[in-house]
Amino acid sequence: MELQAARACFALLWGCALAAAAAAQGKEVVLLDFAAAGGELGWLTHPYGKGWDLMQNIMNDMPIYMYSVCNVMSGDQDNWLRTNWVYRGEAERIFIELKFTVRDCNSFPGGASSCKETFNLYYAESDLDYGTNFQKRLFTKIDTIAPDEITVSSDFEARHVKLNVEERSVGPLTRKGFYLAFQDIGACVALLSVRVYYKKCPELLQGLAHFPETIAGSDAPSLATVAGTCVDHAVVPPGGEEPRMHCAVDGEWLVPIGQCLCQAGYEKVEDACQACSPGFFKFEASESPCLECPEHTLPSPEGATSCECEEGFFRAPQDPASMPCTRPPSAPHYLTAVGMGAKVELRWTPPQDSGGREDIVYSVTCEQCWPESGECGPCEASVRYSEPPHGLTRTSVTVSDLEPHMNYTFTVEARNGVSGLVTSRSFRTASVSINQTEPPKVRLEGRSTTSLSVSWSIPPPQQSRVWKYEVTYRKKGDSNSYNVRRTEGFSVTLDDLAPDTTYLVQVQALTQEGQGAGSKVHEFQTLSPEGSGNLAVIGGVAVGVVLLLVLAGVGFFIHRRRKNQRARQSPEDVYFSKSEQLKPLKTYVDPHTYEDPNQAVLKFTTEIHPSCVTRQKVIGAGEFGEVYKGMLKTSSGKKEVPVAIKTLKAGYTEKQRVDFLGEAGIMGQFSHHNIIRLEGVISKYKPMMIITEYMENGALDKFLREKDGEFSVLQLVGMLRGIAAGMKYLANMNYVHRDLAARNILVNSNLVCKVSDFGLSRVLEDDPEATYTTSGGKIPIRWTAPEAISYRKFTSASDVWSFGIVMWEVMTYGERPYWELSNHEVMKAINDGFRLPTPMDCPSAIYQLMMQCWQQERARRPKFADIVSILDKLIRAPDSLKTLADFDPRVSIRLPSTSGSEGVPFRTVSEWLESIKMQQYTEHFMAAGYTAIEKVVQMTNDDIKRIGVRLPGHQKRIAYSLLGLKDQVNTVGIPI
């Protein structure tokens, strides 16, 4: 009776917890639902009439059914409950959800020694329905079902039954149908719900691709690849991948690959491609919306891929379809020709109508006419231009070597990118008459061993315009020196010449208008005296001896002077006593040496009016204030260029103002392709601003972290070469940067790297208390050479050390040098001889160069000129970059890839992925079934690719980290 009461009590209390089931992910297709059948299924019990029993209860005026069994007082129970035959259909893997309660064995008298608290779940596949024919041997055990919670006596008293929900899956199934069976071996169980279903990945529209409803696969670790179909008017972009997604076993879509884009003439509207409206166009398959037809185009029809130009307007072949149609420019404005002796200077102003383009160039042609005959012809071959006469961008040119008494006509044509599409020309002409004298006709009148007498003549009509003649002469073969004599007559004697020597002589008339045409260059030779052969030998020997004595004296003087200089230098200065100091290079001038910093700003920078500058958005914050992206009007006012704008914050101190202007005074002295370019300053208005060129990709360290693994080794070495070239330029100007790091390198859209940030304070040189402090914060210990940290000795050699750290940052895609070590630990490690290990996939030659930069003795480090030369050789011979340096992932990936903060293995996969900065792949690992560290350490390289890690750099980072992870797991004894 007590057992019957227990079963009845279960029937009354089971519904209190039934509503706790969670919705399954994906789409579920139900094959069997006991609770929904309302007791009409009529399952088979064995033995019949014993064990399992169908019970009914009324709850909320609705009948509720369950199968229960509670033969706990009798031993050797073997009670079976079998479902009806279930048709499998298209299912490959089925999921079985059970809701049940189990009573605590201790709630029965004497503890019921034969009582159990579990039951077994079985299944059997078959192609036929066997009806009531029940054979145990056909069934295969799925699992022993144990409750998470059991119902104890106090739960009965409180009318609270603890409901358990368990789910199991079976697959792959191959027969037409199947049975489920439940075996009781002596428990008090109430089976409230049995739901059997399989999962599908639902129909999906994503990335303009349609993915059909797909049955989830039967193999849990694998993902079923499903090809998508582009929607109407969408295509796979050239070079792109066909759209694919992966259907996981739980019915979830994972790992999307590829995409579709709306074709030319169509734009994306929600999940479809819609034709461009009239007046709009789209010229290629892309994610961009349709664009409005630009200026000077005709209205386009619906779905247009381009907009036709209006009559008289054109589009050059290289012009994008989004650019307005343009036309050839008008003629140059205000052409003038000013004669200056045998030269003419042509000047003009730009066309009043540029045609809507900025690529205006000019061509100059010349025609000469003889006054006597009136004949004219081209004269390009006989005149000389100050620069090539075609493709000029300036608005002036000088034409020389013009002939006297000749009329010249010069034509200046303006052209732009569409001028070649029309036959008409836009030009202006100017004529000028040359009244310059004819070249003098020179002849030799006499000569001796030490002199030459020459005379000349010009036509009588021109003699009245000449006020003097200029005679230029020099030894043949000597291009370094010459002599000039001026005279009012028509002859001259050149004295004090060397015997038996050939001289080059030219005569030129000087008029009020300037120099006239020069005569031909004549060769005249002095006479050889008697015995000139012996004298020449003796003279040559004497001259040679004298020269040797002079050179010896000069060499001795230089040696003594250098020796004295070295004696005055400290041992640390040996590096700077190289010959490069003797080169006549431009030298950097420290703006802080000026009593008034405004003087340095005026000398080295360009003042810009605030009206020429527009601030658009904040892109960062510097030491002195905010940094903006903005636009700067060019001097012509017709064009704007993007710039970066540093501002001086309100409430600045006088020292901050001096430092702010000092940085501008430094930048203004530099002009190099790999140094950030200063456009100008605003120092006369508030807020004060420093305007530099705009670098689209920002700081190098952040850029590399965002593009991890996307560049080839050759591209990375090219970036390093650019940085080294900029530093070579600074070193040649005797400028020491002191803060060279990837964060202070800016990258433009063409991947050109430029050195920036010249604001590091000078306090280090003057204040012995400021060992680790600048006006902007701490000294960058991780990038700074040991001698600079210890003795505040900043030199070009310490910049070379910093460049080695930058090389390491670039090759590791922006990793933090020395990882999480403290500054004190970094300094100690360096002094103990530790150097950063080789990065992953780093060429041996590059790592060797890093190690040279990190020589403890700074005199042994290479100069930047040497570094540029080495990198140039590597770039010219890419095969030399294929030999990789030895790589130990246990040292080189120092991110905590094998242990957590307490030195123990990671508890979760997501925690491990986050530690190696690969957390973006967490869902990929989870979807593929790698939910625990024990499973992850068994992965192969193919497994990493299969879950959707596509970038080679990311694949290697994960693979190398797994090596260390396996070692750690094996060390602590976690079973795998």
Curated annotation (Swiss-Prot):
The organism of origin for this protein: Homo sapiens (Human)
Annotated function: Receptor tyrosine kinase which binds promiscuously membrane-bound ephrin-A family ligands residing on adjacent cells, leading to contact-dependent bidirectional signaling into neighboring cells. The signaling pathway downstream of the receptor is referred to as forward signaling while the signaling pathway downstream of the ephrin ligand is referred to as reverse signaling. Activated by the ligand ephrin-A1/EFNA1 regulates migration, integrin-mediated adhesion, proliferation and differentiation of cells.
Subunit note: Homodimer. Interacts with SLA. Interacts (phosphorylated form) with VAV2, VAV3 and PI3-kinase p85 subunit (PIK3R1, PIK3R2 or PIK3R3); critical for the EFNA1-induced activation of RAC1 which stimulates cell migration. Interacts with INPPL1; regulates activated EPHA2 endocytosis and degradation. Interacts (inactivated form) with PTK2/FAK1 and interacts (EFNA1 ligand-activated form) with PTPN11; regulates integrin-mediated adhesion. Interacts with ARHGEF16, DOCK4 and ELMO2; mediates ligand-independent activation of RAC1 which stimulates cell migration. (Microbial infection) Interacts with human herpes virus 8/HHV-8 glycoprotein L/gL and glycoprotein H/gH heterodimer; this interaction triggers EPHA2 phosphorylation and endocytosis, allowing virus entry.
Keywords associated with the record: Angiogenesis, Apoptosis, ATP-binding, Cataract, Cell adhesion, Cell junction, Cell membrane, Cell projection, Differentiation, Disease variant, Disulfide bond, Glycoprotein, Host cell receptor for virus entry, Host-virus interaction, Kinase, Membrane, Nucleotide-binding, Phosphoprotein, Receptor, Repeat, Signal, Transferase, Transmembrane, Transmembrane helix, Tyrosine-protein kinase, Ubl conjugation
Keyword ATP-binding: yes
Region Mediates interaction with ARHGEF16 and ELMO2: start-end pairs: 606-906
GO MF, one example: growth factor binding
Protein name: Ephrin type-A receptor 2
Tissue: Expressed in brain and glioma tissue and glioma cell lines (at protein level). Expressed most highly in tissues that contain a high proportion of epithelial cells, e.g. skin, intestine, lung, and ovary.
Disulphide bond pairs: C70-C188, C105-C115
Impact noted for substituting G777S: In a gastric adenocarcinoma sample; somatic mutation
Cytoplasmic-facing ranges: 559-976
Post-translational modification: Autophosphorylates. Phosphorylated on tyrosine upon binding and activation by EFNA1. Phosphorylated residues Tyr-588 and Tyr-594 are required for binding VAV2 and VAV3 while phosphorylated residues Tyr-735 and Tyr-930 are required for binding PI3-kinase p85 subunit (PIK3R1, PIK3R2 or PIK3R3). These phosphorylated residues are critical for recruitment of VAV2 and VAV3 and PI3-kinase p85 subunit which transduce downstream signaling to activate RAC1 GTPase and cell migration. Dephosphorylation of Tyr-930 by PTPRF prevents the interaction of EPHA2 with NCK1.
Effect of G948W: In CTRCT6; reduced protein stability and reduced ability to stimulate cell migration in absence of its ephrin ligand
Residues recorded with modification Phosphoserine: S570, S579, S869, S892, S897, S901
UniProt region (Mediates interaction with CLDN4), positions on chain: 1-206
